[in-house]
Amino acid sequence: AGDCSTYDKKSIWSIPVGSNKMNIIKTEIPEVVIIEPIVRGDSRGYFMESFLKEKFEREVKSTIFVQENESISSYGVLRGLHYQLSPFSQSKLIRVVTGKIMDVAVDIRKGSPTFGKWVATILSGENKRQLFVPRGFAHGFSVLENDTVVQYKTDNYYAPEFEAAIRWNDPALSIDWGLPVSDIKLSEKDKYHPMLADARLFDYNENLYG
């Protein structure tokens, strides 16, 4: 059965000014991490550091991002659950520039103590949070507002021949996408992915960063 750890948004203006430039928030799946930049605003607008390599490598994961992608989507669009197989497996660091999504990471490492469990968190242009999804996980998101712009970094290049995916509504996962099912809009491709039980997966003991 699936499992969920959901973290709701926090207003960027409620974050206290301190010496740290971003907060690292652990989820119930230890490898999946929420990153919350410290935002400083006044009447002119705001400023934040959206990525700090040294802090990220020290507190999250030592990896090198090589590609950044951007999409814009309307309300109800659902993309996922996507991943790439070895040797082109990818970590992702996802953020929302404008709008709001429910962002989901699913552990698909056979033998993992959290295999088949998932984390869901709201990322928005307001809360400025980011989600780190490591290799060995499937990723997807549902769009909760029109004209939502999503950016994400990856630590491996896009390799279409190594693409894989799991059905968004697999009952073994029972993911809550935060939308009425009748509002969900899918690509033709995303409608017909295999269920978790039939998908190509990772092994927990495999060194995906080797």
Predicted regions and their residues:
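Conserved metal-binding segment of the jelly-roll/cupin
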Residues: 123-146
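Non-catalytic, conserved peripheral segments adjacent to functional cores
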Residues: 21-126, 146-147, 154-210
